[in-house]
Amino acid sequence: SNVESGVTTTFVLTPGGIESNLPDWIIPASLTLNFLAFACAFAGAYQLIRGFGERQNLALGGIAGVFIFAFLVWAAADNSLNIGGLMNSTLNKAVPLTLGAMSGVLCERAGIVNIAIEGMMLMGAMVGALVGSLTGNIWLGILGAVIAGALLGLIHAVLSIKYLLDQIISGTVINIFAGGLTAFFSAKFMQTYQELNNPGILKPFAIPILSKIPIAGPILFNNNIFIYAMFFFLIVLTVGLFSTRWGLRLRSVGEHPKAADTLGINVFRTRYMAVLLGGMMAGFAGAYFTLGSVGRFDEFMTAGKGFIALAAMIFGNWTPFGAFGAALLFGFSEALAAKLAILGVKIPSEFLLMTPYILTMIVLAGFVGRGQMPAADGQPYEKE
């Protein structure tokens, strides 16, 4: 490493603006980097000579964690980095990705490919800002966003279930439609009349007692309603999909629709319901951009997050918590890029902005085909 001996790295453990008695964590940068480099080299040699066998994925995860930690030590050498703030930012960046991925899980578990998550998010973001501004009520804005997502979900469902249109084409049409319509509304009305684009923003609120837990408390329990809702939906969807009759029926329709139909399950109704729920979830994810994060709508502000959410869904093996883990990974890369720009690290800012998208491509290249996608995913069903 090019870090001089005697230089220290300071990690601040509590997000900014929150009172805490936790001392900062000060570590010798050069010594730590040399030790971590030796540990990685040892792990590599062990893999070559004996191999980690079944524990290979665990070992790879551990080495990746060590590498990231070493990178943070190097980046913040002779400086300080707010780790608590980085983790809080990671969680916030992961919210729309997780909600979008859960939208994908709902649809694809029922056998409908939904690449229209991006368009649904964008429409949800715009309608949320517009309704919130017109009514002066953020909660009505969220409701408007959810309804907008549901309407696009209904269009996708009718095109792909009733008219048997190719699901990828249907999703692409919705993305283009949503992009054009939101850009038109934004340019024509929302940028011209600022009172139509000022919905306000949901403030974070601390959960008593839990928010006082050292380190984890301020990160997890001092947020706005979107983050708490994300955790609630994660639990509800996981239990619903894998521990209830409703979930069993939905999954059977995505695996073997013909067999499900034979057993008396209404394949069409189940798929319509799944895509509508998925649309509502994507609309809610879109509302996060305007009502939970920025407080206004800007053209194409979702910036491809709907597609990254799809990548998170695939990487998470079509399970809600798996997708959440992947969303945290993508969220971390985005939050880290922002922090490194502040630290003035000698890496071009354009490259830092590309990081989440590069990571998406790497993940998809390595993971597509390995996961267990639903057997009838993307296949239209016709009753005989």
Labelled PLM ranges:
Residues 136-179, 232-235, 334:
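Alpha-helical transmembrane segments within multi-pass membrane transporters and channels
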